[in-house]
Curated annotation (Swiss-Prot):
Class of this enzyme: hydrolase
Species annotation: Rickettsia canadensis (strain McKiel)
NCBIfam families linked: dCTP_deam
EC number of this enzyme: 3.5.4.13
Protein known as: dCTP deaminase
Active-site residues, Swiss-Prot/TrEMBL: 137
Entry's family note: Belongs to the dCTP deaminase family.
UniProt keyword list: Hydrolase, Nucleotide metabolism, Nucleotide-binding
GO MF assignments: dCTP deaminase activity; nucleotide binding
InterPro entries, sorted: dCTP_deaminase (IPR011962), dUTPase-like_sf (IPR036157), dUTPase_trimeric (IPR033704)
Single GO biological process annotation from the record: dUMP biosynthetic process
Pathway named in the protein's UniProt entry: Pyrimidine metabolism; dUMP biosynthesis; dUMP from dCTP (dUTP route): step 1/2
Reaction equations catalysed: dCTP + H2O + H(+) = dUTP + NH4(+)
């Protein structure tokens, strides 16, 4: 597998609408304010998190069960700054909508700005022909409240090209998270 360059990413956006909206260069300042960067980088794309968050809470004394997930585990917030409680977790989503080509696997890594503050972002790989908004999982590993800034960079996506086309893509097997919009909760 080879990692794809900024040149390839631009071409895939133009020819296959791979990322919408697409920002062709790194943005580090907005209205004269420093922000957490987003946009195209040398070998990846730094995506933004929207202002839509679901924050884990224990006010309803429920159990987190991935096979029978309860929305009572979460508090919905539409905010410019999401505050994640200590040692807790929040879900967000990318502003960008992705359409992954059939010969590409996309891996997500966190931003060092957040990682150095004890905030970890996790996303499972975006499989060939998957499309949708990416649900982002943010973990606050610190004993203090932590901030996530909406409309700023949250993670970086790396595009890996296979030397061979897959037999069955995510679309072929009708994956349960296909064409998701908004923050998508666990499905079984």
């Amino acid at each position: 597998m080879a990692i794809m360059s900024d040149k390839w990413i631009k071409e895939a956006v133009i020819n296959q609408s791979m990322i919408k909206p697409f920002v062709e260069k790194q943005v580090r300042v907005h209205n004269k304010d420093k922000i957490i960067s987003y946009g195209l980088s040398s070998y990846g794309y730094d995506a933004r998190v929207s202002n839509e968050f679901k924050i884990f809470t224990n006010i309803n004394s429920t159990t987190v069960d991935p096979k029978n997930f309860s929305e009572y585990n979460l508090v919905d917030r539409e905010v410019d700054v999401c505050i994640i409680p200590p040692n807790s977790f929040a879900l967000g989503r990318t502003i960008e909508y992705f359409k992954v080509p059939r010969d590409i696997l996309v891996i997500c890594v966190g931003k060092s700005t957040y990682a150095r503050c004890g905030i970890i972002v996790n996303v499972t790989p975006l499989e060939p022909e998957w499309e949708g908004h990416v649900t982002l999982e943010f973990s606050n590993t610190t004993p203090l409240p932590a901030k996530i800034y909406a409309n700023e960079g949250a993670c970086q996506f790396l595009f890996l090209n296979s030397d061979q086309m897959c037999d069955t893509s995510y679309a072929d097997r009708q994956g349960k998270y296909m064409k998701q919009v908004g923050v998508t909760l666990p499905l079984t």
